[in-house]
A protein has these predicted regions:
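Conserved helicase RecA-like core
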Residues: 2-369
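Intrinsically disordered, Lys/Arg-rich low-complexity segments
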Residues: 365-394
Length: 394
């Protein structure tokens, strides 16, 4: 593998990268940064946590000038990812004014700060709000980044994304980064990019370091098994994935009731609550994060040793995204799948698509826990509110 010094970065940027504690570029960084520095359009396919932000961040730090207005726009599907990208960019280039723009918070402070921004990291809904209010000037933008492009499609944001792209002048440099690239992402690239360079680096997880197992268990014992394993498996940080907000809250509430320190994150929480949750988990103040795919996607979290699939995802690609959060940087990782009758079809699709070596484990002796229910009325009203405001709040 090459060194950062070998891929044409400026000394000031090399120093910033050194301060981040990074010594060697990841595969996506070493293959994409040279083309990005040359001003080429790039399509990058790489797993979450593989270093995509640093890759396009080097281009922004090289090409964007301080005190020259808004010159770069990064679109992200979630608020949390917008904040994470902003944090990395500010460390790479402290001279630039980098701003995160997303819904769920007051818009007036954003209007005030946009005047001085050189780089904006935004979710599509709130950025469209600013465009409609004419509180953001796009005429000087020369670099556009679409981060987690596949998730933009999955979350129904792509029409908003296309509206935004059409407001950005040409010529410009356009970068698309995505965990997976399919026909829909390629079609989007054809409409908005010029002779893009394709780079792929999907293997962040070391298969020799990753153990995948499953338990076949009745649905009414699934929570008891999860609690037993969390209390008896030696682990670092743990992520427990559920398919719905309701299950996420149900699992978190019952873990805490059974003396497992856990915290939940999903799209129904306020921005302040989500930010606090991520901070607590990243700081290891709480060892177990219960989450949905949408809420966790794009979050960069180190030192995750165990992934539990309380619910098996319907889309096999989501399974790959989940397990890609462990067995990184030479560390061991373990994926534990809890299968009831409701999960068998999803599990079969995953095995058919990827043919992983997932070993069956024998169910241990379990003491069945008494579960606490989630109040139905509160969740029903929250779901209705989310359906009504989903796009704009993102």
């Amino acid at each position: 593998m090459s060194l950062f010094e070998d891929i044409g970065l400026q000394p000031k940027l090399l120093l910033a990268i050194k301060k981040l504690g990074l010594k060697e570029p990841t595969q996506i960084q070493s293959t994409s940064i040279p083309s990005i520095l040359k001003g080429k359009d790039v399509i990058g396919e790489s797993a979450t946590g593989s270093g995509k932000t640093l890759a396009f961040g080097c281009g922004i730090a090289t090409h964007v000038l301080p005190n020259k207005g808004l010159q770069a726009l990064i679109l992200t599907p979630t608020r949390e990812l917008a904040e994470q990208v902003k944090t990395v960019l500010k460390k790479l280039s402290p001279d630039l004014k980098v701003m995160a723009v997303y819904g769920g918070v007051a818009i007036n402070p954003q209007i005030h700060d946009l005047v001085k921004a050189n780089v904006v990291v935004a979710t599509p809904g709130r950025l469209l709000d600013h465009l409609e209010r004419r509180t953001i000037v796009m005429s000087k933008i020369k670099l556009l980044v679409l981060d987690e492009a596949d998730r933009m499609f999955d979350m129904g944001f792509i029409d908003d994304v296309e509206k935004i792209i059409r407001t950005i002048p040409k010529p410009r440099q356009t970068l698309f980064f995505s965990a997976t690239i399919s026909n829909r992402e390629n079609d989007l690239a054809k409409r908005h990019m010029v002779n893009p360079i394709n780079v792929t680096a999907t293997k962040m997880v070391d298969p020799s370091k990753l153990k995948q197992v499953y338990f076949d268990i009745s649905r009414n014992l699934k929570l008891s098994l999860l609690i037993h394993l969390l209390k008896n498996e030696e682990s670092g940080l743990v992520m427990v994935f559920c398919n719905t907000r309701r299950n996420t809250d149900f699992v978190e509430k019952n873990l805490r009731a059974n003396h497992v320190k856990a915290i939940a994150i999903h799209g129904g929480l306020s921005q302040n609550k989500r930010t606090k949750t991520i901070s607590m988990f990243n700081g290891a103040k709480v060892g177990v994060l219960v989450c949905t795919d949408v809420a966790a996607r794009g979050l960069h979290i180190d030192d995750v040793s165990h992934i539990y699939n309380y619910d098996l995802p319907k889309d096999p690609k989501d399974y790959v995204h989940r397990i890609g959060r462990t067995a990184r940087a030479g560390e061991n990782g373990k994926v534990i799948n809890l299968l009831s009758n409701f999960d068998h079809d999803n599990f079969a699709r995953i095995n058919h698509e990827y043919r992983f070596n997932i070993q069956k484990e024998k169910k241990p002796y379990l003491e069945r826990v008494i579960t606490k229910r989630i109040e139905e009325k509160r969740h029903f009203s929250k779901r209705n509110d989310q359906r009504k405001h989903f796009k704009r709040r993102r």
